[in-house]
């Protein structure tokens, strides 16, 4: 993917694979504004995740229709994230899927 958004999406896919998560392209025919990807996995606490991820190019925000659809999905119990940088994707995976590190930088075992 040559576009900046594509680079962000590629990073999401790589991080999902590295963290033993599924990362599916999400399309919903006749429904514009839905998130780009679904990440499915079990986090470092044993909690099952099915997260909808909207990837954007750095500095871009979701369009009005996307914001409306994301809000509607959240109102129905879905978890929706908008991630626009590689750093935001890294934070998402650190928060949920990557093992904690101690003060010395060593991974704390599960």
Per-region residue spans from a language model:
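Catalytic phosphate/metal-binding cores of nucleic-acid and nucleotide-processing enzymes, i.e., regions
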Residues: 1-110
């Amino acid at each position: 993917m040559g576009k900046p958004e594509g680079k962000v999406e590629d990073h999401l896919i790589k991080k999902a694979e590295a963290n033993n998560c599924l990362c599916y392209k999400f399309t919903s025919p006749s429904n514009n504004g839905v998130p780009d990807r679904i990440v499915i996995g079990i986090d470092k606490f044993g909690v099952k995740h099915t997260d909808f991820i909207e990837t954007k190019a750095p500095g871009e925000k979701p369009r009005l229709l996307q914001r409306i659809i994301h809000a509607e999905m959240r109102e129905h119990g879905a978890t929706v994230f908008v991630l626009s940088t590689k750093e935001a994707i890294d934070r998402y995976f650190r928060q949920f899927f990557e093992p904690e590190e101690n003060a010395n930088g060593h991974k704390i075992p599960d």
